[in-house]
């Protein structure tokens, strides 16, 4: 089973779309887009994704991708 990375469509529109595209190309991840993840305060202030249910943030799309891979390395399944 692959790790699940979930994105909010509104956060994608705020700049996380580049992170989504990069992660979606990784066959070892299941990357999913949702209409809303109900993290509206977080969504309005930063780029983020849920990685197996845990919030991972980044100031930029590149930082978000790096933080997601770091999270996955530190939390093996």
Swiss-Prot record:
Highest taxon listed in the record's lineage: Bacteria
InterPro entries, per the entry: DUF1450 (IPR009910), UPF0349 (IPR022916)
Membrane-crossing residue ranges in chain numbering: none
Annotated Pfam families: DUF1450
Entry similarity comment: Belongs to the UPF0349 family.
NCBIfam families membership: PRK13669.1 (NF010190)
Protein name per the record: UPF0349 protein LMHCC_0204
Species of provenance: Listeria monocytogenes serotype 4a (strain HCC23)
């Amino acid at each position: 089973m692959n790790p699940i990375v979930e994105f909010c469509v509104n956060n994608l529109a705020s700049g996380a779309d580049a992170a989504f595209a990069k992660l979606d190309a990784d066959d070892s991840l299941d990357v999913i887009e949702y209409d809303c993840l109900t993290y509206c305060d977080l969504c309005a202030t930063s780029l983020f994704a849920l990685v197996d249910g845990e919030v991972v943030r980044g100031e930029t799309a590149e930082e978000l991708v790096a933080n997601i891979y770091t999270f996955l390395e530190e939390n093996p399944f």
